[in-house]
């Protein structure tokens, strides 16, 4: 029997407001434990929450960027549960009237485009953070009360690769709106996945399992890949899928049972009595709409139509707002668009991945990389020499022009000087000339290599090829 996988994702995004959602405490990451708290966050008796208006602005901006309808008459609700990182024994969230609903994003994966629906986006407060040491646990309440939006997809995702593409696109859009930095390593973007399988052709959903401990997009994909196989094995052996919560173990690549899943009724939602209903008038909504910047899809379209990039290259560039903004600044500084894109997608991305860094953590600037690209474009240096210049720029910064000058890296483009070297190489390699004339194309590569060796890699490659062809034809 063949099964179809059905996946829905719940993504929590911390909003980068200066203060928390219901208290004036700072909402910044990295402070000493239990220093960014107030009596409101800790649930002291008699204190009342006050809604941070910036949180509503940010939530609306994110929802609109995800093509959602804004609920202009909304409210908050209490979600009741007890856990050590939740000092009030309830969380202020939104239940039946989320601020955003009925959205969608388009993803590109495995050669096709697919629209994934988004059920809802709602505001809520984050919980504290537990850490475990030996036979006891520690709790840090700095995160308690940090503003969140939870973004819930429709069960439209059918493969782990689609889930990965959805998360990449969602993260990109949120970063472009500037409401969150979406750093998974700091917990400002977290994802839970719901997955079930059903026989192909069956309309009714199977029993779902929720996956947690998904600390990277790759772990989301791996966890889903394992879980769809596990569920298929259970059904094919005559078993029944239980509704449960499982965690992904990155060491084994398997999912492990945590607990039987609670239903919505277990949380005993009811309207938050300490907050009035929230009314969003048309003027407020229109102001937030006007603040939405150019989003990835629009920027990709502009790169293709105005800068002549291929749809693939444009799509790769716009996924990361940091990379895309850097590219834009390079263009402003006069660099060629296609060559700039090649460097950013190639050597720059390879370096960042290898070193696990962001662009801001390097000595590169749009100005110095644009200067290097212009030196390649005007023939001052070759792309090969450019790699040497790049290695210096990314570590130490400075001026590309000065590096080329100080290290004597200017490309040899003087035809007379190159002709002398070409002639000498040909005189010393008669067999290679003969091989080339007999159809062995590799021989020309050997000859080019000898010339590059003689010039320490500084010969102009197109000129070398032209002179070689001319001089071989004469012999």
Curated annotation (Swiss-Prot):
Record's catalysed reaction(s): L-glutamyl-tRNA(Gln) + L-glutamine + ATP + H2O = L-glutaminyl-tRNA(Gln) + L-glutamate + ADP + phosphate + H(+); L-aspartyl-tRNA(Asn) + L-glutamine + ATP + H2O = L-asparaginyl-tRNA(Asn) + L-glutamate + ADP + phosphate + 2 H(+)
NCBIfam families the UniProt entry points to: gatB, PRK05477.1-1, PRK05477.1-2, PRK05477.1-4
Highest rank taxon of the organism: Bacteria
EC number from the UniProt entry: 6.3.5.-
SUPFAM superfamilies the UniProt entry points to: GatB/YqeY motif (SSF89095), Glutamine synthetase/guanido kinase (SSF55931)
GO biological process: glutaminyl-tRNAGln biosynthesis via transamidation; translation
PROSITE patterns with a match to the protein in the record: GATB
Organism of derivation: Lysinibacillus sphaericus (strain C3-41)
Annotated InterPro entries: Asn/Gln-tRNA_amidoTrfase_suB/E (IPR017959), Asn/Gln-tRNA_Trfase_suB/E_cat (IPR006075), Asn/Gln_amidotransferase (IPR018027), Asn/Gln_tRNA_amidoTrase-B-like (IPR003789), GatB (IPR004413), GatB_C_1 (IPR042114), GatB_Yqey_C_2 (IPR023168), Gln-tRNA_amidoTrfase_suB_CS (IPR017958)
General function of this protein: Allows the formation of correctly charged Asn-tRNA(Asn) or Gln-tRNA(Gln) through the transamidation of misacylated Asp-tRNA(Asn) or Glu-tRNA(Gln) in organisms which lack either or both of asparaginyl-tRNA or glutaminyl-tRNA synthetases. The reaction takes place in the presence of glutamine and ATP through an activated phospho-Asp-tRNA(Asn) or phospho-Glu-tRNA(Gln).
A single MF term (Gene Ontology): glutaminyl-tRNA synthase (glutamine-hydrolyzing) activity
UniProt keyword list: ATP-binding, Ligase, Nucleotide-binding, Protein biosynthesis
Protein family membership: Belongs to the GatB/GatE family. GatB subfamily.
The protein, known as: Aspartyl/glutamyl-tRNA(Asn/Gln) amidotransferase subunit B
Pfam family, one: GatB_N
Disulfide bridges in this chain: none
Coiled coil: none
Record bears the keyword DNA damage: no
Subunit structure: Heterotrimer of A, B and C subunits.
